[in-house]
Amino acid sequence: MRKLHCALFLILIAAPAVAQTPPSPASGRAEIGAFNRAFDEATRRMDNAASLALWEEDGTSLLPSTKPIVGKKAIAAFLEKVTAQLQGAHMEKFEDMCFDIQVSGNWASEWCVEHQIVQLPAGKPPFDGWGKMLLVLHRGADGKWRLKQEMWNQALPPEP
């Protein structure tokens, strides 16, 4: 009986360490590549639900000339407001390149340069913008990487 208790005790101690083994940096980078593809696709489709699914519940978005947008509900409200203001617009082009992916356990960061062209309704000229993003990602208990924090600012187009 004592051996059984010792064995159960050892299993209980070891189980959390085994269950929460963080990904290796190489596998983490591959998983973040998959996250980036989902992020790109959601942005191209201007799909608020798909974009929101990539956020942590307590995520924070830091955009230029705005107060911090804290929490998934606030981020959803912001996305809905922007979508309403852009009624009839569609993404003509979205591309980005991400660099310097750093993985440490269940946390990661990367920075990206993005370019988007949005066709606006009513004959308005298209929006043609460049930006830089710094992303902090967290890998949840379900194994999915999500945005914990984002900071975005304008960028200059690359020189020809």
Protein language model annotation of sequence segments:
Residues 26-33, 48-106, 113, 125-129:
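A solvent-exposed, acidic/Ser-Thr-rich amphipathic alpha-helical stretch
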Residues 116-120:
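Beta-strand elements of well-folded, non-transmembrane domains
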Residues 130-158:
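Short beta-strand edge/turn micro-motifs at domain boundaries
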